[in-house]
Amino acid sequence: MTRANARELAVHLIYGREFTGEEPEQVVSIRLAKEYYAKLSQENDIYSERPSRAQTAYIDKVVSGVANRAEELNAEIQKYSIGWDVSRISRLTRSLMQLAIYEILFVEDVPTGVAVSEAVRLAKKYDGDDTGSFVNGILGTFARSLQYRISWNCYYSLYIIMRLLIAIR
């Protein structure tokens, strides 16, 4: 199973939690159990290959992370979805964007561009081309603003250090 497939599987689990309200650990352990997984493989090709231990750890990390930070992630989506209320965005699209923003902020080995392009690819696959454009717009704006926030924080930190060094002299 590729990382892209593991990401898609994680989206399925995040989306499923929207309906069940189950604890993230419970969702991952139940849905990835051998017996349950075998049933799912008959319904969707994404389940044809079981995830490795590393992929299972990634899936567990992102599903739990998105669940634990849902309010924060939704606030970021809301900030950049001008003219749209988060509650009006389809649950699947919201799940895709939550995962992408979580990956950008908290998963170090996932480049920002990969998180955005994978979310767009999955949005097009499940919700159509228009949704892919919508997701690309929101996540692209989020990523650019994040770069600005990071550079400003670095600049400000450097400024404080310089002021302290001057004060010490």
Regions found by a protein language model. Give the residues of each.
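N-terminal interaction/assembly modules
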Residues: 1-169
